[in-house]
Amino acid sequence: MSIVVIGRGNVGGGLAALWRKAGHEVTALGRGGGAASGAGVVVVAVPGPAISAALSTVPGLVGKIAVDATNAFPSRNEAFPSLAEEVKSFTGAPVAKSFNLNFAVLYDQIAPQRVPPGSFYAAEDGARDVTGELITDAGYDPVPLGGLDRARAVEDLAWALIAAMKDGAPVFYRFAVPGEL
């Protein structure tokens, strides 16, 4: 799959590395922008308040499936029901919300886990399968929460996950049926 990641920080750079390792063709764009025209999917991995500024420097977004990995720290654009909806305003195509609840500092510790950690996502129909594949290829177990109308709930879970950190250390999360662990 051809992926353009907008944002080269801990999340964007880390996901780009995981997907390259899984065999995807990945281009990571930084503050200088760049084009998304050759991508099959665009992943937005910038601070939530920077979505508009970051995406306005990237031509070729219209019609691209997008995965929003942003968080609303320290604030969100209240003109949209979720940050994922703000991303959709730039692409006009199916969007998913994911990867905002997976700590980037743990990316290099995914593979050694006995079972893959979970990754929540909310997605529109046209983005659901692609997002599930990207989650799996990053080493996580996809945990679907429904359509894009659930994106705000995924965003708001960030506060709960931060509160669940063990002695200030980031955590993996996993949902399993009895006997799976």
Regions found by a protein language model. Name each.
Residues 1-34:
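NAD(P)+-binding Rossmann beta1-loop-alpha1 motif at the extreme N-terminus of oxidoreductases
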Residues 15-16, 87, 131:
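Hydrophobic residues within alpha-helices
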Residues 28-29, 94-100, 143-147:
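General beta-strand structural signal in soluble alpha/beta enzymes
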Residues 33-65, 69-74:
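Rossmann-like NAD(P)-binding element
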Residues 70-113:
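Rossmann-fold NAD(P)-binding glycine/threonine-rich loop
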Residues 119-181:
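Active-site-lining helix/loop region of Rossmann-like oxidoreductase modules
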